[in-house]
């Protein structure tokens, strides 16, 4: 069974949950947003933890590989769409390197 699509979808959903869960308190603290932003923050961060728990692999491996997806998401999506800053070619190259690292960690052949 090929777990790559499932793993990648889980990582993408996890990254979105973490990015939103970290951005909402940023809005509250930095931009004077409502304290009510902390409620969806808690829900997003709880969903982030839950999504990480769905991976069948060892937690340390999942956390390490997820870091690469988070970096790529933060640069390729959040920086561009939310912050309105176009990533440089170096940002994109770094994100691609991180995704290669994630793929090596998660999809390398292993003995059972």
Curated annotation (Swiss-Prot):
Cell inner membrane keyword on record: yes
Pfam families on file: UPF0060
Membrane topology: Multi-pass membrane protein
Compartments (UniProt record): Cell inner membrane
Keywords: Cell inner membrane, Cell membrane, Membrane, Transmembrane, Transmembrane helix
Main localization (coarse): membrane
Similarity remark: Belongs to the UPF0060 family.
PANTHER family per the UniProt record, alphabetical: UPF0060 MEMBRANE PROTEIN YNFA (PTHR36116:SF1)
Protein name: UPF0060 membrane protein XOO1791
Source species of the chain: Xanthomonas oryzae pv. oryzae (strain KACC10331 / KXO85)
